[in-house]
């Protein structure tokens, strides 16, 4: 009995463990059974049962780790914002192809604007121009692309175009080159009403500015309006002028950036014989505003002097900023020349003063001055001009008759390039005694003149006495 009970207990425990193993085996997620291709229920393969000898063989696959599935909310990328195309013309009351054109000085500019559907008989277009200051904000225009509704043209503008000129206020101010009878015409408007183009024939500092397009019916001319800003730019012209210097003078060169607009930064960088000049004390730059734009002049002075080495070559590099993002850069080079310092002498020979200058450039002449008179003396003669042994130079001589009234003489060289100091020589000479015969003649002439004057005075006095005597006698007779 005891042994039977023990055997029964062992059997039950064995069956329990077999059942647990079978349950765990069937519950394994990695165990799959492949039975041909998937299909409808009518095409499904028969069940895999050991009783069915013709059943297909099952192929177990190794267990695969489960893949963690992410929620769509965590993996989905944010959708890009929908692309918005240009607004349809039909939904906009005004649309211009360019609201802020920038064009070169002297170019021809066209601006096209489209307005609501209308007919010629009931619509009216006006275009007004407003001047803008240099580098100023838009001013009266709140936004270049904003459509103004029921807003009249602000005061202070000049009328450029009116599609109904017979309705134009007679007190309106037309812009130069616009209006009836304007010649030459600076503005023209072409195209059908509602799809018109404004043509600025020549863009200048005077024709740039803010243009206000105002559109409406004849009985409501300010229904819609829009602003267009027209800006002009003009690159600078660059020239370099290396100064001619005398021996002993420092080398110099001047660069000029002329007639550019707008007047943003124009920066110069100087190079002397290929080496940059960093000392600000050697560079002087000045900007000036002119009616046709701006001009900047920059001058560099070298530490080297003429005659102590070869001539210097200067290069100026100009960087002009058209706006905050655009700039242009140009270079100009030139070599300074050295002129010999002339020797000037003065001597008095007889009745003439003679001035001589050696080794002066061709084309240089003398100018004479006497005493404190700032006007050159008239009687000047160049006696001779000979070579002095240096190419392009000569020795010149000038003579001047001596003066009987002045004692101070100045002979000055004229015709040197700009920047050369005044070169002159001062001399003194006492007036020579006059010839005795000449003195006698002068005295005789002076005596004759005095005698004639006395005679004329006597004749006039006698005539006056006779006239007064005759007048008194006539009056006496009338009284009797």
Curated annotation (Swiss-Prot):
Record flagged with keyword Zinc: no
Stored Pfam families: Marek_A
Keyword Membrane: yes
Glycosylation sites: 40, 52, 117, 150, 166, 331
Keywords: Disulfide bond, Glycoprotein, Host-virus interaction, Immunoglobulin domain, Inhibition of host complement factors by virus, Membrane, Signal, Transmembrane, Transmembrane helix, Viral attachment to host adhesion receptor, Viral attachment to host cell, Viral immunoevasion, Virion, Virus entry into host cell
Cytoplasmic side: 469-480
Domain Ig-like: 236-328
Protein location: Virion membrane
Quaternary structure (record): Interacts with host complement component C3b; this interaction inhibits host immune response by disregulating complement cascade.
Family the UniProt entry places it in: Belongs to the herpesviridae glycoprotein C family.
Protein name: Envelope glycoprotein C
Species in which this protein is naturally found: Human herpesvirus 2 (strain 333) (HHV-2)
Gene responsible for this protein: gC
């Amino acid at each position: 009995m005891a042994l039977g009970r023990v055997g029964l207990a062992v059997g039950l425990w064995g069956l329990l463990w077999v059942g647990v193993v079978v349950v765990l085996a069937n519950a394994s997620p990695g165990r799959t059974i492949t039975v041909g291709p998937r299909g409808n229920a009518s095409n499904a393969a028969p069940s895999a049962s050991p009783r069915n000898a013709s059943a297909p063989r099952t192929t177990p696959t190794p267990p695969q780790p489960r893949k963690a599935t992410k929620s769509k909310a965590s993996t989905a990328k944010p959708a890009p914002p929908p692309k918005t195309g240009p607004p349809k013309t039909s939904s906009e009351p005004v649309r211009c192809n360019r609201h802020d054109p920038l064009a070169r000085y002297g170019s021809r500019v066209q601006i096209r604007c489209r307005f609501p559907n209308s007919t010629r008989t009931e619509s009216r277009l006006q275009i007004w121009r407003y001047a803008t200051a240099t580098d100023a904000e838009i001013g009266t225009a709140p936004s270049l692309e904003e459509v103004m509704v029921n807003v009249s043209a602000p005061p202070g503008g000049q009328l450029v175009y009116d599609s109904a000129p017979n309705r134009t206020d007679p007190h309106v101010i037309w812009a130069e080159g616009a209006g009836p009878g304007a010649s030459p015409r600076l503005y023209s408007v072409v195209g059908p009403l509602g799809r018109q183009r404004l043509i600025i024939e020549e863009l200048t500092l005077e024709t740039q500015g803010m243009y206000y397009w105002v559109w409406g019916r004849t009985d409501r001319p300010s229904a819609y309006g829009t602003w267009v800003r027209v800006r002009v730019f003009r690159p600078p012209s660059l020239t370099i002028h290396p100064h001619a210097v005398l021996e002993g003078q420092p080398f110099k060169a001047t660069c000029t950036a002329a007639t550019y607009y707008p007047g943003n930064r124009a920066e110069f960088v100087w190079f002397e014989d290929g080496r940059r000049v960093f000392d600000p004390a050697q560079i002087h730059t000045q900007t000036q505003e002119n009616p046709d734009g701006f001009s900047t002049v920059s001058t560099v002075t070298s530490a080297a002097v003429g005659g102590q080495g070869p001539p210097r070559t200067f290069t100026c590099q100009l960087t002009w900023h058209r706006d905050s993002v655009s700039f242009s850069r140009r270079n100009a080079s030139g070599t300074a020349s050295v002129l010999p310092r002339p020797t000037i002498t003065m001597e008095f020979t007889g009745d003439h003063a003679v001035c001589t200058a050696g080794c002066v450039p061709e084309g240089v002449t003398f100018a004479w001055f006497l005493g404190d008179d700032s006007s050159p003396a008239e009687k000047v003669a160049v006696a001779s001009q000979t070579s002095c042994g240096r190419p392009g130079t000569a020795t010149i001589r000038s003579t001047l008759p001596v003066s009987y009234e002045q004692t101070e003489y100045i002979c000055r060289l004229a015709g040197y390039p700009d920047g050369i100091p005044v070169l002159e020589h001062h001399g003194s000479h006492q007036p020579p005694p006059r010839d005795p015969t000449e003195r006698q003649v002068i005295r005789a002439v002076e005596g004759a003149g005095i005698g004639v004057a006395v005679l004329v005075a006597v004749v006039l006095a006698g005539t006056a006495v006779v006239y007064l005597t005759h007048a008194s006698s006539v009056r006496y007779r009338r009284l009797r």
